């Protein structure tokens, strides 16, 4: 899907978002609009949203009522035909792939900690369950950055989309980048120390 098509979808959907979804929680709006920009139909998103308002899956009803966001997404995904096993396996496959992308175990742990504690983890699980690859997931993260209203965001400039209240959503892309830089610096320090010891 081209940036122009994504922009068109986002502008049209954002103008009428409250007619389709209860956006009292802005994070939810971001996810619904992100899914819409990925080409997921309104009917499928509505099915997920309906599950948010009336969770019927016994295994996760209490967690959903307690506000555990990740569990609530699992409930919603079951409403469109995915099983708990599907969701769990998707997450495991993603984290296994992620492990091969980092040299050290510490780097892997930092990355997974970041992804498990913010909206990125949810988007990765949804995207993976829908069969999307890393490049398309990156577009979703770019969209979230644009949705934050960050005028310095490359995605915001490309899509020419600026929203108010940028502090509502975590800047997951910057957080991830900072963690990666910190890990690389730590690895360089370790290599330098090892070289000194070897002398």
Residue ranges and their predicted role:
Residues 2-31, 66-125, 154-198:
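Intrinsic disorder/low-complexity detector
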Residues 48-57, 140-148:
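Amphipathic alpha-helical segments that form the core helices of the histone-fold
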Residues 56, 61-65:
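Metal- and O2-centered redox machinery and metal/ROS homeostasis
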Residues 130:
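Surface-exposed, Lys/Arg-rich phosphate-binding patches that contact polyanionic backbones
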């Amino acid at each position: 899907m081209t940036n122009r098509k994504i922009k068109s979808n986002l502008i049209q959907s954002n103008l009428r978002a409250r007619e389709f979804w209860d956006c009292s929680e802005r994070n939810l709006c971001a996810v619904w609009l992100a899914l819409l920009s990925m080409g997921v139909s309104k009917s499928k998103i509505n099915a997920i949203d309906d599950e948010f308002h009336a969770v019927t899956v016994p295994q996760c009803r209490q967690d959903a009522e307690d506000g555990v966001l990740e569990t609530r997404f699992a409930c919603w995904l079951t409403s469109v035909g995915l099983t708990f096993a599907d969701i769990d396996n998707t997450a495991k496959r993603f984290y296994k792939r992620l492990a091969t992308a980092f040299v050290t175990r510490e780097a892997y742990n930092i990355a997974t900690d970041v992804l498990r504690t913010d909206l990125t983890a949810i988007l990765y699980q949804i995207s993976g369950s829908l069969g999307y690859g890393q490049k398309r997931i990156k577009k979703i993260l770019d969209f979230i950055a644009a949705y934050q209203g960050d005028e310095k965001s490359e995605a915001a400039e490309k899509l020419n989309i600026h929203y108010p209240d940028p502090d509502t959503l975590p800047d997951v892309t910057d957080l991830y980048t900072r963690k990666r830089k910190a890990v690389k610096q730590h690895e360089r320090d370790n290599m330098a120390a090892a070289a000194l010891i070897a002398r």
